[in-house]
Amino acid sequence: MSAANMPTTTGAQGSGNQVPTTSTTIVNHFRELIKEPKNLDEAANYLFQTLLDDAVVGIFNETHHLRKSGNLAALDGVPEDSTYRMCEMPNLDIFGISTAKKPMDCTCPNCDRLVAAARFAPHLEKCMGMGRISSRIASRRLATKEGATSAHLHSSGNTGGTDDEDDVDWSSDKRRKKSNQNSRNNGSKKNNGKTF
């Protein structure tokens, strides 16, 4: 069915009944009314009434369809009043979020001690033995343990030794010597200690 032949309902002039018509019928009836100059008021009223009826019936049908399909509530959306309400409860801010201080302590998974949140990462590093200082202590412990083991093996008369014991300890030769305080420039190369 084309748009020109779509059935619409119109109210007959002077009577209260609704007559289903098509748009071509409406246009033909309007042209007949315009032919005579004395019927122009009737033609204007007829055209207005037809357009109004068509718009009202269209809105009614669409609303009825949305209500029956359950989509009418989705068309309305969420009411805006609830988003701008202020909360006036004690210990809550205007958005309803608690203002009470939260405990800032963490429990260490390794030793089950309560540690302040700001100190948790350094504590966990030391507690698990993974920090920089812990690795240095572990290296020293291994070096002293190896030294005691090799001294024990040499004193017992075993001269065979393993390949690990024969290797040169590379880390002991590269230990950094402390610099003398007088030889430092404190970061400035200016004047080199000379006065002019």
Curated annotation (Swiss-Prot):
Pfam families xref list: Sgf11 (PF08209)
GO molecular function: transcription coactivator activity; zinc ion binding
Modified residues (Phosphoserine): 172
Entry keyword set: Activator, Chromatin regulator, Cytoplasm, Metal-binding, mRNA transport, Nucleus, Phosphoprotein, Protein transport, Transcription, Transcription regulation, Translocation, Transport, Zinc, Zinc-finger
GO biological process: chromatin organization; mRNA export from nucleus; positive regulation of DNA-templated transcription; protein transport; regulation of transcription by RNA polymerase II
Keyword Protein transport: yes
InterPro entries, sorted: SAGA_su_Sgf11, SGF11
Domain of life, source organism: Eukaryota
Tagged with keyword Disulfide bond: no
Region (Disordered): 1-22, 141-196
Gene Ontology CC entries for this record: cytoplasm; DUBm complex; nuclear pore; nucleoplasm; SAGA complex
Localization (cell): Nucleus, Nucleoplasm; Cytoplasm
Summary of the function given for this chain in its UniProt record: Component of the transcription regulatory histone acetylation (HAT) complex SAGA, a multiprotein complex that activates transcription by remodeling chromatin and mediating histone acetylation and deubiquitination. Within the SAGA complex, participates in a subcomplex that specifically deubiquitinates histone H2B. The SAGA complex is recruited to specific gene promoters by activators, where it is required for transcription. Required for nuclear receptor-mediated transactivation. Binds independently on SAGA to promoters in an RNA-dependent manner.
UniProt record similarity statement: Belongs to the SGF11 family.
Domain remark in the UniProt entry: The long N-terminal helix forms part of the 'assembly lobe' of the SAGA deubiquitination module.
Quaternary data: Component of some SAGA transcription coactivator-HAT complexes, at least composed of Ada2b, not/nonstop, Pcaf/Gcn5, Sgf11 and Spt3. Within the SAGA complex, Sgf11, e(y)2, and not/nonstop form an additional subcomplex of SAGA called the DUB module (deubiquitination module). Interacts directly with not/nonstop. Interacts with the AMEX complex component xmas-2. Interacts with Cbp80; important for promoter recruitment of Sgf11 that is not associated with the DUB module.
The name this protein goes by in its record: SAGA-associated factor 11 homolog
Organism in which the protein naturally occurs: Drosophila simulans (Fruit fly)
Gene transcribed to yield this protein: Sgf11
